[in-house]
């Protein structure tokens, strides 16, 4: 059975209440992630490690939460394949380096070489 045949993949296969519950759970996960990242950064700061830490935030895929009439990640729609890739450097946080936004597509395969370049290893 293809993933498209699984009940709940398309929004016309679930009722409005189920869709609202699914969206609420999805957004609650984002809120929780924001909270624990904040807690983690606070611990790094408390322990004097934040000034020597490169923080990288990314994910392996996006998610559809009803956009295009679909749920899950199994499409090439932008919401499923365009993901955050954020590097937070000590120099940026100290105001010594201006943050730059790169809008061109990148790959997660770029993360390791980028970290090696930043740490000169």
Residue ranges and their predicted role:
Residues 1-14, 84:
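Core domains of carbohydrate- and sulfate-ester-processing enzymes
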Residues 1-3, 37, 55:
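Conserved hydrophobic/aromatic pocket- or pore-lining residues that grip, position, or stack substrates
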Residues 10-53:
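A long, amphipathic alpha-helix that forms part
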Residues 23-33, 75-83, 94-119:
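A short beta-strand-to-alpha-helix junction
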Residues 36-43, 64, 114, 118:
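Short alpha-helical functional segments enriched in proximate histidine and acidic residues
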Residues 42-97, 107:
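Histidine-centered active-site microenvironments of extracellular/periplasmic hydrolases
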């Amino acid at each position: 059975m293809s993933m498209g045949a699984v009940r709940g993949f398309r929004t016309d296969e679930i009722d409005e209440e189920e869709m609202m519950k699914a969206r609420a759970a999805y957004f609650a996960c984002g809120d929780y992630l924001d909270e624990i990242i904040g807690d983690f950064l606070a611990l790094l700061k408390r322990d004097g490690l934040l000034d020597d830490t490169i923080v990288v935030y990314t994910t392996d895929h996006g998610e559809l939460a009803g956009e295009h009439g679909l749920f899950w990640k199994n499409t090439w729609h932008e919401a499923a394949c365009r993901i955050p890739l954020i590097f937070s450097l000590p120099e940026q946080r100290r105001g010594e380096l201006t943050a730059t936004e790169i809008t061109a597509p990148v790959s997660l395969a770029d993360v390791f070489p980028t970290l090696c370049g930043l740490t000169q290893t």
